[in-house]
A protein has these predicted regions:
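An N-terminal hydrophobic leader/cap segment in hydrolases
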Residues: 1-22, 34
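A catalytic-pocket lid/entrance helix-loop region that shapes and gates access to the active site
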Residues: 142, 148-175
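Conserved hydrolase catalytic core segment
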Residues: 115-154
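Active-site loop/oxyanion-hole signature of alpha/beta-hydrolase fold enzymes
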Residues: 61, 67, 72-120
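Conserved HGGG/HGGXW glycine-rich cap/lid loop of the alpha/beta-hydrolase fold
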Residues: 29-88, 304
Length: 310
């Protein structure tokens, strides 16, 4: 791991039980990686890729459980894409693109000497996972797509475009929680007040005497050209690149990005796909509930059997 260095800002790990690494991308930008557990565990390692404006803190609960499994300990890492979390912000917003972000993932995998791994991709992170399956299939030993598939619903993308980079600045995390609740209550009606506060703490960060978004507001440019009358090209070829490895899809039943018709089409191409339906959640499921974590734990154990024979 000569190309990865320990955290310069240990507070990024906080009290979460994870450690931080920084990796330099091909263009010199600094990429932040969270890690739970230790390399060389009995189970396959796991690489987590967050959503559009999200960062590796979204995988805190899941990462801690998977890494700390006494029977099957494993190394879990989560990559903050450029412009998110602890990674550097790009002075050229055009670099917030799939080709550049895929190159960043490959740079991190090389720097930390990651072997074949199970990839958990939320939303945009799931698209990157499908692209990785086409670009470097040997890197992947199993996949969990969190509320994403080969077809993205324009209506949902338009909803995201309405607030990404445009939310008002809260004076406290409690006020931020109320902002998020107003935006997301229809998709996440069962979340408690403390859940919204946790999400606020994973959306904004403390800067000076106030709060700022924990992502580059210029990420809004990635959605600027969305046209509800012109759906994005489907990614079926990239989805099919995952055919040789176990596959799970987590579906928020209130989602407006991944819909049932797309899941049915995915099932038609992959009869063995494991679909986990999450009630009372939309885009994207939080992966924090005990029942969801238990299902994911069982799935990654099956990936171990498939790849390692135990």
């Amino acid at each position: 791991m000569d190309d990865a260095r320990p955290a310069e800002d240990p507070s990024r790990a906080g009290d979460t039980g994870c450690t931080s690494l920084f990796v330099t991308a091909q263009d010199g930008l600094c990429l932040h990686v969270r890690a739970w557990g230790a390399r060389g565990g009995r189970g396959l390692p796991i690489v987590c890729l967050p959503g559009l404006t999200r960062n590796g803190s979204d995988f805190q609960e899941l990462g801690a459980v998977l890494a700390g499994d006494a029977a099957q300990p494993r190394w879990v890492v989560a990559i903050d894409s450029r412009g998110r979390g602890g990674s550097g912000y790009d002075p050229n917003p055009e670099n917030y693109s799939f080709p550049v972000e895929l190159a960043d993932v490959l740079a991190v995998l090389t720097a930390i000497e990651m072997g074949p791994a199970i990839f958990i991709g939320t939303s945009r992170g799931g698209i990157l996972t499908m692209l990785l399956g086409a670009a470097r299939p040997a890197a992947i030993a199993g996949v969990i797509l969190n509320d994403i598939g080969p077809v993205l619903e324009p209506k949902g993308l338009m909803r995201l475009r309405g607030y990404v980079g445009k939310m008002p600045t809260p004076r406290s995390f409690e006020e931020g929680a109320e902002i998020l609740r107003r935006l997301g209550d229809a998709q996440f009606p069962a979340l408690a007040s403390e859940d919204w506060v946790l999400q606020a703490k994973r959306t904004w960060k403390t800067a000076g005497s106030g709060l700022v978004l924990d992502y580059d507001p210029e990420l809004s440019q990635t959605l600027a050209d969305i046209d509800i009358e012109r759906p994005l090209p489907p990614l079926w070829a990239q989805f099919d690149s995952l055919a040789r490895v176990p596959l799970m899809v987590v579906h928020g039943m209130n989602s407006d990005i991944l819909v049932s018709a797309t899941i049915d089409a995915m099932r038609a191409r992959r009869l063995d796909i494991d679909v986990l339906q999450v009630p009372d959640q939309g885009h994207a499921p939080l992966l924090t509930e005990d029942a969801v974590i238990a299902r994911i734990t069982a799935f990654v154990t099956l990936c171990d059997v498939s790849a390692l024979g135990f």
